[in-house]
Amino acid sequence: VPMYPGGKVETETDASARTFADFIGAKLVSADEHEVVAELSIQPHHWNLARIVHGGVYMSLLDSAMGLLVSLHYPNCPVVTTNLNIHFTEPASEGTLVCRAKFIHRARSTMTVEGRVYLGEDRLCAHATGSFRVLKLPS
């Protein structure tokens, strides 16, 4: 299942095969108006030279899941990331990364989202907050 499967985000299905999240191997586990959960099976191409997951992989997984959460509230409206702040807490080199995104604050055209990436269900590897802007609000 690509990052943007059927359901509320059905209109994103065709485009999902061309997204960066799909390219890196991110898979959607669940998505509703309160939380998005995605996962990524760590492969050697996700590593940096230290043979741990590259920080850009965490950032991409977080940005994709957090952005999808905002997009669920504004179907067919472009959403962009205006800020992404991340803390890397623990390295990972094998296993499955699980990303959970939830709202912190919602306003009319801007939203603040929190995302956490775990190795499995309990080892926190990265924590992020992000601000997102809806470029074209529905009429």
Regions from the PLM with identified roles:
Residues 1-139:
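Terminal targeting signals and extreme-terminal segments of soluble enzymes
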